[in-house]
Curated annotation (Swiss-Prot):
It holds the Pfam family PsbH. The gene is psbH. It is found in: Cellular thylakoid membrane. The keyword Acyltransferase does not apply. This is Photosystem II reaction center protein H.
């Protein structure tokens, strides 16, 4: 196979192939970030749906024009 500069840069990323962290690894951390992302999406949805009313935030199409 031909060696390229891009392959040399990306090789360290592939050197850990097949290795997994013992036990649950970073799964709890991933779950925490998924929960925070869910809360973020819910806040955005509530602002858009006008369920969460914020002073000075107008969610009409006219405000974008």
């Amino acid at each position: 196979a031909r060696r390229t500069w891009l392959g040399d840069i990306l090789r360290p990323l592939n050197s850990e192939y097949g290795k997994v962290a013992p036990g649950w690894g970073t799964t709890p951390l991933m779950a925490v970030f998924m929960g925070l992302f869910l809360v973020f999406l819910l806040i955005i949805l509530e602002i858009y749906n006008s369920t969460l009313i914020l002073d000075g935030v107008n969610v009409s199409w006219k405000a974008l024009g």
